[in-house]
C-alpha cells in the first residue's frame, strides 16, 4: 500500500494533518460504491457516452477516444457531474456487462465475456447464452438469425411464443438443418407456449448453424 492509495482499488487515503478530509473520504466511498459487485454498462464503447449516470462504470476498450484517450483497459467511472475517474482492474476481477447481459472476467488486458476459468497461459473455459427476438413470416420454415457457434458445445436451445402463431399449421418444430426437431417437436402455437430443448448430451457444431423453425401440418 502506498502512502496515498490502497493497492487493489486505489482508494484515496486520508493523510496526516490533511485539510478537508471529507473530500478524500467521499471519493473513496464513491469508488467503493462503483467497484464493489462491479457492473460495467459496456466494455465495448470506444468513446464516453453523452450523459452518463453518476457512478456508472465502463470498461475502456483499446483505442478509445475522447475523454477516454490513453485509458485503455481501465475502468472509467462517471463522476463529478460529467467528469471521469479511473481504476485499474486486476486479473481475475469479475463484472456483469449490462449491455451484453453476461458476466466477464478480466484477463489482464481485456474483459472476457462468459469466462468461468482463466488458465495461467491464456486458456479459458467459457459459457454463454445468446438471445434473439424472431418475427415469423409466411412459409413452411424460417431460419433465424441465431447461429450456433462453430467449435462451441451446445447444451440446448429454448424458445417461447410471445404472440399466437396464426395460419393452418397445427404445431411447429425447432432444430437445425438435417435435424429439424432436434430441440423440440409438436410445439404449441398459442402465446405462452414454449420449447425447452435440452439435449441428452452436449453437441458440438463445427460450422455455424442457424436455428430453424418449421411448421407442421400447415
Residue ranges and their predicted role:
Residues 140-177:
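Beta-rich globular "head" domains
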Amino acid at each position: 500500500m502506498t502512502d496515498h492509495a490502497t493497492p487493489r482499488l486505489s482508494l484515496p487515503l486520508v493523510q496526516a494533518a490533511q485539510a478537508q478530509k471529507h473530500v478524500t473520504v467521499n471519493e473513496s466511498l464513491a469508488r467503493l460504491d462503483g467497484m464493489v459487485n462491479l457492473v460495467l454498462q459496456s466494455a465495448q464503447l470506444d468513446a464516453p457516452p453523452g450523459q452518463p449516470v453518476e457512478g456508472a462504470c465502463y470498461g475502456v476498450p483499446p483505442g478509445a477516444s475522447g475523454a477516454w484517450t490513453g485509458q485503455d483497459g481501465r475502468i472509467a467511472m462517471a463522476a463529478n457531474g460529467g467528469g471521469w475517474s479511473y481504476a485499474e482492474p486486476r486479473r481475475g476481477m469479475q463484472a456483469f456487462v449490462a449491455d451484453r447481459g453476461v458476466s466477464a472476467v478480466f484477463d489482464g488486458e481485456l474483459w472476457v465475456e462468459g469466462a468461468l476459468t482463466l488458465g495461467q497461459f491464456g486458456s479459458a473455459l467459457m459459457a454463454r447464452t445468446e438471445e434473439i427476438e424472431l418475427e415469423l413470416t409466411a412459409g413452411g420454415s424460417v431460419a433465424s438469425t441465431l447461429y450456433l457457434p462453430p467449435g462451441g458445445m451446445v447444451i440446448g436451445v429454448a424458445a417461447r411464443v410471445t404472440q399466437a402463431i396464426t395460419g393452418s399449421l397445427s404445431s411447429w418444430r425447432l432444430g437445425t438443418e438435417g435435424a429439424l426437431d432436434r430441440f423440440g417437436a409438436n410445439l404449441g402455437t398459442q402465446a405462452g407456449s414454449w420449447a425447452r430443448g435440452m439435449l441428452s448430451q452436449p453437441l458440438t457444431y463445427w460450422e455455424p448453424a442457424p436455428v430453424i423453425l418449421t411448421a407442421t401440418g400447415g
